[in-house]
Structures are given as structure tokens and as C-alpha cells.
Regions:
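ABC family nucleotide-binding domain
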Residues: 1-154
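C-terminal boundary and immediately downstream tail of ABC-type ATPase nucleotide-binding domains
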Residues: 144-145, 151, 155-174
Length: 174
């Protein structure tokens, strides 16, 4: 792929990192606006309006003027999700979005992700949250040592795993 093709593809994707990757010197609102104004060249007033809409969607409208160090891990991850959905991507990639969270915060982030899935958002999620995968995913893959060991619909994947390594894994996490 050429560099312009790669850039065009990236413009269709959102990405939520496990470590949030928020700019520490920017408020929640500014963090969401940054990609809109810098990469998308959206006028500031329009970017601010859109940023406020998505912060509201993830339950963070009351924290728009807070800096990352003033937010809990779950709140930071919700800002990261707002940033990812701000420009209406075709797909969002989630890299273990709950792994850096306190157990109490995991549920609120998973609930937002579930709402995104229910709204029709295509998501590729790397996760160890098997209950979430079982209840929300339309396809589940088990990858071990960089190899796809099994792929199936959630019910079949969890009820009748064909791969021995997957059966071993599921026996340890269930």
C-alpha cells in the first residue's frame, strides 16, 4: 500500500489503547477535539460541538474540563473511546481496553462498548473478558503464539471448542 492509501485507511478507523494515551496537558474536551482539528482539519467550533456530543455519549460531559490526572482510569478510558468515535469511524480497534483498569471500572467501560456494538459499530477487540466476548461479539477468535487457533460464532466457540489449546484456556478462565 502507498502512504496515501495507508493514511486513507487510517482515517476510517478509531483506536482505543489499553493505556488510554491521552495528552496529559489537555483537558478531556481538548483530547477529543485534537484529532478533529489537527488530522481532520475540522473548524474548532464544529470540533468542540462534536467533542461535547461524544463526551456526553460516554457519560463524561461533566468532566470535559478535567485533565487526565484528575480522572479515574475508567473515566480516562471513556474519554479515549469518545476520541475514537468522534469522527464516525467505520471500525474501532480496541487493544485490551480494560486491562489497565481497576475491577470496579471494567463494567462501565464494557457497557459503553456494548452500547457501541448495539448501535452497529464494527469493533475488533483484543480482550481477556470472555463474558463480554460471548455476549457481545458476532465472531470470536482465539490467537496463540501469533496464530489464529480457532474462529467461530460465540455460542459455538464457547460451548464446543475444537482446538485443544482453546479448551485448556477456557477451562482456566471460566
Amino acid at each position: 500500500m502507498s502512504k496515501p492509501e495507508i493514511r486513507a485507511l487510517r482515517m476510517k478507523m478509531g483506536f482505543v489503547f489499553q493505556g488510554y494515551n491521552l495528552f496529559r496537558n489537555m483537558t478531556a474536551l481538548q483530547n477529543v477535539m485534537e484529532g478533529l482539528t489537527t488530522a481532520r482539519k475540522i473548524p474548532e467550533a464544529e470540533a468542540k460541538k462534536r467533542a461535547r456530543e461524544v463526551l456526553d455519549k460516554v457519560g463524561m460531559s461533566d468532566r470535559e474540563n478535567f485533565y487526565p490526572d484528575q480522572l479515574s482510569g475508567g473515566q480516562q478510558q471513556r474519554v479515549a473511546i469518545a476520541r475514537a468515535i468522534a469522527y464516525n469511524p467505520e471500525v474501532i480497534l480496541f487493544d485490551e481496553p480494560t486491562s489497565a483498569l481497576d475491577p470496579e471500572m471494567v463494567g462501565e467501560v464494557l457497557e459503553i462498548m456494548k452500547e457501541l456494538a448495539e448501535s452497529g459499530m464494527t469493533m475488533i477487540v483484543v480482550t481477556h473478558e470472555m463474558g463480554f466476548a460471548k455476549n457481545v461479539a458476532t465472531r470470536v477468535m482465539f490467537i496463540d503464539e501469533k496464530v489464529i487457533m480457532e474462529e467461530n460464532e460465540p455460542q459455538e466457540f464457547f460451548a464446543h471448542p475444537k482446538n485443544a489449546r482453546l479448551r485448556e484456556f477456557l477451562s482456566k478462565v471460566n
